[in-house]
Amino acid sequence: MNIQALLSDKVSQALIAAGAPADCEAQVRQSAKAQFGDYQANGVMAVAKKLGMQPRQLAERVVELLDLTGIASKIEIAGPGFINIFLDRQWVAEKVEYALTAPKLGVAPVEPQTIVVDYSAPNVAKQMHVGHLRSTIIGDAAVRTLAFLGHNVIRANHVGDWGTQFGMLIAYLEKMQNENASDMGLSDLELFYQQAKKTYDEDEEFALRARAYVVKLQSGDEYCRQMWRKLVDITMAQNQVAYDRLNVTLTKDDVMGESLYNAMLPEIVADLKAKGLAVESEGATVVYLDEYKNKDGEPMGVIIQKKDGGYLYTTTDIACAKYRYETLGADRILYYIDSRQHQHLMQAWTIVRKAGYVPESVPLEHHMFGMMLGKDGKPFKTRSGGTVKLSDLLDEAVERAGKLIAEKNPDMPADELKQVINAVGIGAVKYADLSKSRTTDYIFDWDNMLALDGNTAPYMQYAYTRVVSVFRRAGVDETSLTLPLVITEDREAALATRLLQFEEIITTVAREGTPHVMCSYLYDLAGLFSSFYEHCQILNAESEEIRQSRLKLAMLTAKTLKQGLDTLGIQTVERM
């Protein structure tokens, strides 16, 4: 049930009937304060200006023509021409009843699209570090949201699995006579990487062999391909451990590494030349873009093939977009990559559009994000200034949550305690990130993220346990709530209306890729439930009808909190 969309449609119809153009915008928003109703239509002023009318006069005409029979109990005009809409409590009660029993909390089915989401993208032969966290969890929240709405979502893990470093690694493994790479863990592999690099820099003969292996690997040499495959498999097996711990939906089947596009690269370069988009310049192949200027004010040259015949990230990204449209059949393509890559992506996509590889009707969206910073406002590092490994961060989160939870639950069975600690620790790290606008940098702070009050995962998880505890105490389930829902108190109405706004919120998150909007909504919802719980007797209500009505509101609150947190990839627990 998307109330905002319903009211926008009704107000637009009234505006058009009052003489507004067909493309007018009703600008219906959720009201910031209860005195302004539940929703406010702000579009009258802009339309009145176009029509040369007094806004108040147009607002009066719109209200006369606005048919909200059975939906609104009152419509008021405020200020110069704001239209305040107060929802009818009986109508709200009926919609809550529907949401309780309908699939997906009453969220309307969408016209399904095929949406490719590019996220996580770790490198082979490297352990995941905190720099991979934002892309991984924000991208996964987007994936979960789109899938919940009914879209066909293709997860694309654009793994860094190609490049000159593989010749070096293969040569070093051979040198150490350790071809049985499957026995290695990723930590061994990372040490190998460092030792291989040192040997490469110091031993010219080794460096020559490494370079020869790069050529062999690129030419499809069976031995080199086998060794490369082992390196990729070891890395992805270890990364899967991190994904599982993070409750992220990526699997090995979602890996679409850089190597996937290798065969396309010569064709892309040849095609861009044939279309007159790419030209030779000092031995390299370059696309000059009028949209981007260099420091001399001339069109910027984007290299797609080096003088030595090698390809660049831009070439791969062009092939990647083409593949996602032509082979995967994407209707929309989202990239969760940090903001520093923005110009690079925009240049690649400009070439993609000019070449006609992806039509304008298919959006290419860079959902960029800022950095995770330490308390000093600098990029988050270890005390010694090194990169923080993701596994170490998650270990510390679980350890800190363990102290918090074990202290409060000395009698909880060990298995349940372990599950709760894990859900709270991992949830705290994820929620601290997801609750911030993705476009900004944010400060990583253990104390804030594990706090049991404020907009944190522990608070949200506790809010959920508080709601479900009502049903444990009442000894009832959904099937025993047979009386119709009635709303008599303001706090009931506020909670019920906010519950019905779930579809508006999840639609916004799906459109804009902004999980912090869901976090804010759930936090607000938890606060409204807390106020309702404190001021409205549930189990000892004055009548059975009111008791069941309030239990229904509590039940929809529990379902909405659980579903909302699930779209963020945050686990709920039954008690804390």
UniProtKB/Swiss-Prot annotation:
* GO molecular function annotations of the record: arginine-tRNA ligase activity; ATP binding
Description of how the protein assembles with itself and partners: Monomer.
Instruction: Respond yes or no to whether keyword Membrane is given for this record.
Output: no
Which catalysed reactions does the entry list for this protein? tRNA(Arg) + L-arginine + ATP = L-arginyl-tRNA(Arg) + AMP + diphosphate
Q: Which family does it belong to?
A: Belongs to the class-I aminoacyl-tRNA synthetase family.
Q: Which gene encodes it?
A: argS
Q: What is this protein called?
A: Arginine--tRNA ligase
Domain of life from the UniProt record: Bacteria
Q: Which PROSITE patterns match?
A: AA_TRNA_LIGASE_I
Chief place where the protein resides? cytoplasm
Residue span of the signal peptide, if any?
none
Q: Place the motif 'HIGH' region on the sequence.
A: 122-132
**Pfam families, alphabetically?**
Arg_tRNA_synt_N, DALR_1, tRNA-synt_1d
Subcellular location per the Swiss-Prot or TrEMBL entry: Cytoplasm
Can you supply a Gene Ontology BP term from the record?
arginyl-tRNA aminoacylation
Enzyme Commission number, as recorded: 6.1.1.19
UniProt-listed PANTHER family: ARGININE--TRNA LIGASE, CYTOPLASMIC (PTHR11956:SF5), ARGINYL-TRNA SYNTHETASE (PTHR11956)
